[in-house]
Amino acid sequence: MARFVVAALLVLLCLSGLEAIQHAPKIQVYSRHPAENGKPNFLNCYVSGFHPSDIEVDLLKNGKKIEKVEHSDLSFSKDWSFYLLYYTEFTPNEKDEYACRVSHVTFPTPKTVKWDRNM
């Protein structure tokens, strides 16, 4: 019985230690296909390497939140960090600016990464 209690306490300590670890997300914004003005495409925001899992991701058009956005299920890597993909259909042109805004406990304020049509 005593061994069980000790083992249970060790497991709890390990799990609580995982919550104390914080890793800032890496944010990558890119289109599925090379950008061509007037041609439908998909805008992707891949957020990876973050911990803990609580995160808020928004895709933006000219600084305003795009409402029709889909995302993958929250997944984790071998190192227990998390990753997600947010995406939406869009039609690029010369005047509109697209970006991904991420809020996470590791950022004092939300971080915004602009889409570079040449990447």
Curated annotation (Swiss-Prot):
Disulfide bonds join C45-C100. The keyword ATP-binding does not apply. Gene3D superfamilies: Immunoglobulins. Residues 25-114 form the Ig-like C1-type domain. It is found in: Secreted. GO terms for cellular component: extracellular region; MHC class I protein complex. Residues 1-20 form the signal peptide. Keywords: Disulfide bond, Immunity, Immunoglobulin domain, MHC I, Secreted, Signal. Its main location: secreted. InterPro entries: B2Microglobulin, Ig-like_dom, Ig-like_dom_sf, Ig-like_fold, Ig/MHC_CS, Ig_C1-set, MHC/Immunoglobulin. GO terms for biological process: antigen processing and presentation of peptide antigen via MHC class I; immune response. It comes from the Eukaryota. It holds the Pfam family C1-set. Heterodimer of an alpha chain and a beta chain. Beta-2-microglobulin is the beta-chain of major histocompatibility complex class I molecules. Component of the class I major histocompatibility complex (MHC). Involved in the presentation of peptide antigens to the immune system. Belongs to the beta-2-microglobulin family. This is Beta-2-microglobulin. The lineage of its organism: Eukaryota, Metazoa, Chordata, Craniata, Vertebrata. The gene is B2M.
